[in-house]
């Protein structure tokens, strides 16, 4: 047998041995280590068009032995000029969420300020979230549909929206979180936004001109100043933070002073950073930790009050 034949035989034997070993190996499926992101296309009757939303499901959500398990839910709202998928594409939300047993929903709000428009009858982004989105989530997914298991948060425009939902619908949420919130947006005038014309152009279509009824009804500071004591006691816990280099830094400080003066339960943090995804990627981790803690230690039931 020449050297080439011996070499060929050796290769055949080695390959055969490897194949035999492989045939006896049990290949385990890769374990899922990050939460799963699923997109839902929802046909809104109130807004008159399809509004997608993302759902971040817990790592073990699909395990057969957990098919009867229900989860708390955190709604995260995007900012102005953003969309429903910002949280899952601009932050490591799915990775961070893998540590927690909660469902996270990121709705589409377009540039509607999470408000029922005073000028466009079909732009009902506040009613959509309360009357359509939340019921749809609770129908499609295994979420607990009680106040103690529901939280809402957001960044910038979404921070404004989250706080507003907490103030207007305190019986629905146990926790509100605002990151760099545009908390006084309903009071902004054109002169306030000189140099930020693109932002200004989104406001009149939603809130109307001047002191319109829609502006007044969605002015967070006015809403909080006029709340009677029994409604203050019914508010969810409010978490706020803002970067010290953020253009909205002072307005967040002013808002917190109002919370303090009215003795509204809250936590406020000032941190290095600006109005950027780098800041929000870091701070959403704190929101998840706070939500998980709140869900584990639910607040007492709060009597429903009309918004």
Region locations from a protein language model:
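Bacterial N-terminal signal peptides that target proteins for export
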Residues: 1-9
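Bacterial N-terminal signal peptides
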Residues: 8-17
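Non-catalytic cap/lid and distal C-terminal segments of serine-dependent acyl enzymes
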Residues: 21-307
């Amino acid at each position: 047998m020449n050297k080439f034949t011996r070499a060929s035989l050796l290769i055949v034997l080695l390959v055969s041995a490897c194949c035999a070993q492989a045939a006896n190996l049990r290949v385990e499926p890769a374990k899922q280590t990050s939460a799963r992101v699923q997109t839902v296309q929802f046909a809104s009757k109130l807004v008159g068009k399809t509004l997608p939303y993302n759902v971040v499901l817990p790592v073990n959500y699909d395990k057969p032995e957990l098919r009867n398990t229900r989860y708390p839910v955190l709604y995260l709202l995007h900012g102005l000029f953003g969309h429903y998928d910002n949280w899952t594409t601009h932050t490591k939300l799915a990775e961070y969420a893998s540590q927690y047993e909660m469902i996270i929903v990121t709705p589409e709000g377009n540039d509607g300020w999470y408000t029922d428009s005073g000028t466009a009858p079909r732009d009902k982004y506040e009613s959509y979230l309360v009357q359509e989105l939340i019921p749809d989530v609770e129908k499609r997914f295994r979420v607990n549909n009680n106040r103690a298991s529901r939280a809402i948060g957001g960044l910038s425009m979404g921070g404004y929206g989250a706080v507003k939902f907490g103030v207007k619908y305190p019986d629905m949420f146990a926790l509100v979180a605002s990151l760099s919130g545009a908390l006084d947006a309903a009071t902004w005038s054109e002169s306030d936004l000189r140099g930020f014309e693109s932002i200004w152009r989104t406001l009149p279509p939603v809130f109307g001109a001047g002191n319109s009824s829609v502006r007044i009804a969605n002015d967070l500071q006015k809403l909080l100043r006029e709340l009677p004591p029994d409604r203050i006691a019914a508010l969810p816990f409010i978490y706020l933070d803002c970067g010290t280099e953020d253009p909205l830094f002072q307005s967040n400080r002013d808002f917190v002073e109002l919370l303090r003066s009215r003795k509204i339960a809250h936590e406020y943090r000032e941190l290095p950073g600006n109005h950027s995804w780098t800041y929000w990627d870091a701070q959403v981790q704190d929101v998840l930790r706070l939500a998980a803690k709140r869900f584990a230690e639910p607040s007492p039931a709060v009597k429903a009050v009309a918004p």
